[in-house]
Amino acid sequence: MILRRANSFRFVVAALALAFAFALPAAAQNDNDHTLEAMQDEMNRSVARLQLPGQQKPFYIQYRILDVDIRSISASFGDLISSTHTRNRFMSVGVRVGDYQLDSSNFISQDGFQGSSSSAGEVGIDRDYNSLRQDLWQATDFAYKEALVNLSSKQAFLNSLARAPEIPDFSKEPPVVDVQPLLKSDWTSRNWEDEAREASRVFRNYPDLYGTRLHYYIVYTTYYLLTSEGTKLRISHTVSGIEASLSTQAIDGMSLHNYYSDYAQRPGDLPHPKDVSKSLAQVAQQLEDLRIAPDVSDYEGPVLFDAPAAASVLAQTLEPSLSGARPPLSSVPQFDQMMQQMGAHGDWGGRINTRVFPLNVSLTDNPTATTFQGQPLFGSYDVDDEGVRAQRVDIIENGILKNLLMSRRPGPDFEQSNGHARSALLSVPQPLSSNLVFQATNTLSPDDLRKKFLDICKSNGQQWCIEIKRMDNPALAAQTQQDFSDIISGIAQGLSSGDRLPLMVYRVYVSDGHEELVRGAHIKGLDLRAFRAIAGIGNDFTVYNFMQNAEAGITGTALDTFGSVEGGIPSSIVAPSLLLEDVELGGFHGEPRRLPLLPAPSLQ
């Protein structure tokens, strides 16, 4: 049964607001930005006149423009490797033919996937009127003709089915007007090159680390959206981050790596070099310790996930099931089989009002929140990338699934968007989390949770059990092609079974609680079913900020979930330590690489 929301009142309010709001863009032109003016004029012409003889007119047109201004600095051992400043402007034009019930979108044919018929590319960076109109005109013409072909192919496929889907293709939403002032880029308030030099100098203390890179990113973006329904947006945003990758080899040749990341909305909120150096020294020492740590052996039993590790695992396992959007129709049977094998279809579709988590657990996603218990959240926004107001979504209430994240692509359970369509670099917006908060009652202090963990180990007759303090992030850690290939091969072996990649893994001995670091572990087959019965939940709720992959949710792996500042989506997840009673770990079974013939040179 479709759960519907009444939108009539919202549409009336929005219509009244539009009369006043459309005056905003004219005032915005005082900043010499003619983007919205060019978009509006070409939109008016397309709505009035775009039609091939004997063919349907478009019922929906959207123009998306993204200005990106990036400062990127890389350093190692106290010296700069690169320092660049890049400006780009990207355009995407989407055209839909048909109607809200059945249109030209969301169809996979032999020619590929059509989210909505679109034309995309780079345009001039000067925010001028004439060249942008020219680009929009050509892109709109191409997208319209493509939409007609797509709708014809889609209708032919639907006619071949015994029963065509009844779910609409596109939801009706009230238009939103939000034209914000442009942000002025600030590159001089702090000397970022000197900070990168100073922070990376700590790597000189670790000559056995073969690859070390420290990256500073400061990104200013301005997003424009104009639709034929009346939505008009100009939203400026800042994202900044520090990311580091470190790699080496164990004595037996096993490839090892580690990473560091810290993110902030504003550049001025990034940590200062001394704090960065201290954190880099910690992850470098962890990597040094891994070089001499013993291999992990195969294991099955209780696992204690510290809060950062629990947050990472939840991000990977939850994301594929949070979306309530309908998968695209496909005339290619192999595609659906492949997506099923990769775990791309979520576990929660069609399960509204059923228990999916323990009864003491709730889960919310709230893009309008900016802090959690005084800690800043990284995934906040006011309007999503389809022009829908951001909304808090109570996904799980007391263990019962109540809601899912929605874009304007309806699904079997919900037809309306709840403002969660997100994208990176004008990719097709997908329903993705923003600030995801795992909540629970009957929680335990860290000491009590650890005692329960050891008690379970003892009752199982085990001499030691496993604690995971940190999970891997391949998007940051893999800096070389060989590193990337090693990680890909490891992930590929467990795509359909839910294998996970822990980084800092410890044996905890029951006799006295002492810890022993081990290396080479991977978690076997950990999926959402493992969280239906959680043995213990800590009260140490921790904010875990990360860059989410724009295609998160396809396979539910670390590589699929996490991204970098350069092309990811700001996100947060709040999670406590979690104790799972039955987790399986496997050891390293790959081929080690040859060690360098000579030792690393001494560093001055």
Which residues fall in each region the model found?
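Long, low-complexity, intrinsically disordered N-terminal extensions of eukaryotic proteins, enriched
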Residues: I2, A26-A27
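Bacterial N-terminal signal peptides
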Residues: F11-A23
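Hydrophobic alpha-helical elements and their junctions with loops/disorder across both membrane
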Residues: A21-A26, P53, K154, Q462, ...
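Dual-mode signal for accessory low-complexity, basic/Gly-rich regions
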Residues: Q337-Q604
